[in-house]
Amino acid sequence: MTPSLGIASLPTSSSVGSALRNLRILTKALRYHALPRTAPVPAVPHYTGPLMTRDSADTLRRAHDKGAADWQGSLDLGRSQDTVTLDAEGFGFRDQHYPWPGKLKDRTLYYWDGEEFAPISRYSGSLIKLVPTEWGAPTFEIDGIKMLPTSKLSPFEDARRKVELVAPAGKVILDTCGGLGYFAACALDAGVGQIRSFEKNADVMWLRTLNPWSPDPDAAATGGRLHFSHGDVSQQIEQIASGSVDAILHDPPRFGIAGELYSQVFYDHLARVIRKGGRLFHYTGAPNKLTSGRDVPREVEKRLGKAGFKAELALDGVLAVKR
């Protein structure tokens, strides 16, 4: 419901103060709605069946072979614990029975597609694949290139550290390249006011519906705060109103894949849409300067400075504040 501005009560000082407070609330809400009205992602229920790996399938079979009638553990990448019933034909999970999977490959996640356990991967010019990790939260690969860091900590916890840099509580945030949605999920956990997320790749969007660590925009817990759109942010940024966001999370693909998201033109747009004092975290990774011939983080820092930010290296990227 739109807050009342209390205009009829302006003659008293208390009602003036109330009206001004309501006006600030309404203004902040309207700033979010100044973001472009791209088509939202059609509601696709998130998968709730078992997610299998070669190791988890072997674990269930060993338990059955030892005579166990059930097994307790997680078949949703560590998000919850369930009691799984075991029999000669397969296993029962959340009131549904599944046959024993056939031969499974290493470093591959499988979901029940209604007929069999199928790998969570697609090929549309590039092979895109959801990949299990020792941390629970998966990463994903494009043509064998890992898109999220996993060597030292969970990709989800890595995202949380970066999101904390922009202090998301109560803010309107632009998430330029949604990916698996870990930035958005961590911002939601931290009490973000609204977050608008774009994703260009339809196959990555499909991965999200199968990943229990990816936030569901339609879930009750999200409270309508996550608006997820299929779109190219390098184009959509032109439609976003100036000064309409409080903070930005920018996690683009590698420079060689999406150079337009590292361009001065794009950075100028980021500076335009964020309010003065707003924070931006730009993930760059740590590309090898000797093999690549360039220092991408320093180049980003310099371009952001030219766009109107005060920028410095932080974690594996650049943290910038709008001057």
Set out the residue ranges of the language-model regions.
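Conserved class I S-adenosyl-L-methionine
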Residues: G170-G179
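Conserved SAM-binding loop of SAM-dependent methyltransferases across substrates and taxa
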Residues: L180-V192
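A short acidic, Gly/Pro-enriched loop at the edge of an enzyme's catalytic core
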Residues: E238-L249
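Class I S-adenosyl-L-methionine
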Residues: N288-R323
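A short glycine-rich, Lys/Arg-flanked "PGG" loop and its adjoining helix->strand segment in the class I
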Residues: Q264-K276
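S-adenosyl-L-methionine
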Residues: N201-I240
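N-terminal auxiliary segments of SAM/dcSAM-dependent transferases
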Residues: P36-P132
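Conserved beta-strand signature within the Rossmann-like core of class I S-adenosyl-L-methionine
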Residues: G277-T284
